[in-house]
């Protein structure tokens, strides 16, 4: 019996990052963790900055960092639209650590005109990238 799969397209503002048949997709939506498989009910959701984990048709996994965006689930396809998408292997861990430190420093020395929401978004993105890196390290260690 053939594996039940769904067409997945992951697109950034710059280019198409992934297009193919997948057994599953795991992302963090606005209301929590989402697991999408063949036959999932139609859905439209915001995606929080974080990890997208796919299990390809052949059973191999691939992990991406998403800066946030939109998820659309239709009966025959799933689309992920994000401003920034990075393959986990392409994330610069040191740059993410530095971005986290900068955001924390800005928040600690904030004045009256400080944009706290923007700093929180930058901090969330940096921390999400670091979580993706840690996940990859754990998988390699197994």
From Swiss-Prot:
GO terms for cellular component: plasma membrane; proton-transporting ATP synthase complex. Belongs to the ATPase epsilon chain family. Disulfide bonds: none annotated. Keywords: ATP synthesis, Cell inner membrane, Cell membrane, CF(1), Hydrogen ion transport, Ion transport, Membrane, Transport. It is found in: Cell inner membrane. The gene is atpC. NCBIfam families: ATP_synt_epsi, PRK00571.1-4. This is ATP synthase epsilon chain. GO terms for biological process: proton motive force-driven ATP synthesis. SUPFAM superfamilies: Epsilon subunit of F1F0-ATP synthase C-terminal domain, Epsilon subunit of F1F0-ATP synthase N-terminal domain. PANTHER family: ATP SYNTHASE DELTA/EPSILON CHAIN (PTHR13822), ATP SYNTHASE EPSILON CHAIN, CHLOROPLASTIC (PTHR13822:SF10). HAMAP family: ATP_synth_epsil_bac. It comes from the Bacteria. Produces ATP from ADP in the presence of a proton gradient across the membrane. It is a peripheral membrane protein. One of its GO terms (molecular function) is proton-transporting ATP synthase activity, rotational mechanism. InterPro entries: ATP_F1_dsu/esu_C_sf (IPR036794), ATP_synth_F1_dsu/esu (IPR001469), ATP_synth_F1_dsu/esu_N (IPR020546), ATP_synth_F1_esu_C (IPR020547), ATPsynth_dsu/esu_N (IPR036771). Gene3D superfamilies: ATP synthase delta/epsilon subunit, C-terminal domain, F0F1 ATP synthase delta/epsilon subunit, N-terminal. F-type ATPases have 2 components, CF(1) - the catalytic core - and CF(0) - the membrane proton channel. CF(1) has five subunits: alpha(3), beta(3), gamma(1), delta(1), epsilon(1). CF(0) has three main subunits: a, b and c.
């Amino acid at each position: 019996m053939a594996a039940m799969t769904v067409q997945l397209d992951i697109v950034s503002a710059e280019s198409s990052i992934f297009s193919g048949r997948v057994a599953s997709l795991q992302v963090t939506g606005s209301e929590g963790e989402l697991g999408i498989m063949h036959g999932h009910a139609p859905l439209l959701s915001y995606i929080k900055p974080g990890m997208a984990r796919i299990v390809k048709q052949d059973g191999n996994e691939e992990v991406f960092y998403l800066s946030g965006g939109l998820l659309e689930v239709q009966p025959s396809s799933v689309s992920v639209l994000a401003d920034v998408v990075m393959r986990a292997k392409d994330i610069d861990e040191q740059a993410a650590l530095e971005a986290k430190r900068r955001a924390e420093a800005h928040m600690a020395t904030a004045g009256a005109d400080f944009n706290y929401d923007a700093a929180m978004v930058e901090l969330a993105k940096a921390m999400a990238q670091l979580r993706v890196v840690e996940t990859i390290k754990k998988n390699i260690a197994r």
